[in-house]
């Protein structure tokens, strides 16, 4: 059942779609493929699914000429911040911050750039 207000999907801008797909696949285990309709090549767009069925539709990595200067950030749950930030840098991303802790009611998180320069964060939820 789709819930009112639930995120339907996300689109990640990329100047190199295949590089971005490889980054997210190698770092987070997301599964990528060319669009099912066969009319758009994988170098221009790839759809993906992420663990946990976080949105009912697929996510999309789409080719752009230039990454927008600002936009939405998404926070990705991970089991281990240290191991994941190491995977981010190993796979071509960039660590932007140390771990940020805002108190007991906010999970620790850390910002990074993907291979395309998009800013996102990883977070961990101990005990969940």
From Swiss-Prot:
Pfam hit, one: Ble-like_N
- Can you tell me where the transmembrane regions are? none
UniProt keywords, alphabetically: Virulence
Looking up InterPro entries in the UniProt record yields: Anthracycline_SecMetBiosynth, Glyas_Bleomycin-R_OHBP_Dase, Glyoxy/Ble-like_N, VOC
Q: Does the keyword Oxidoreductase apply?
A: no
Recorded hits in SUPFAM superfamilies, A to Z, give: Glyoxalase/Bleomycin resistance protein/Dihydroxybiphenyl dioxygenase
Q: Do the record's keywords include Signal?
A: no
The pathway noted for it is: Mycotoxin biosynthesis
Q: Which ranges carry the VOC domain?
A: 6-125
Top-level taxon of the source organism: Eukaryota
Briefly state the protein's biological role.
Glyoxylase-like domain-containing protein; part of the gene cluster that mediates the biosynthesis of the selective antifungal agent ascochitine, an o-quinone methide that plays a possible protective role against other microbial competitors in nature and is considered to be important for pathogenicity of legume-associated Didymella species. The pathway probably begins with the synthesis of a keto-aldehyde intermediate by the ascochitine non-reducing polyketide synthase pksAC from successive condensations of 4 malonyl-CoA units, presumably with a simple acetyl-CoA starter unit.
- Record-given protein name: Glyoxylase-like domain-containing protein
Q: Which organism is it from?
A: Didymella fabae (Leaf and pod spot disease fungus)
Taxonomic placement: Eukaryota, Fungi, Dikarya, Ascomycota, Pezizomycotina
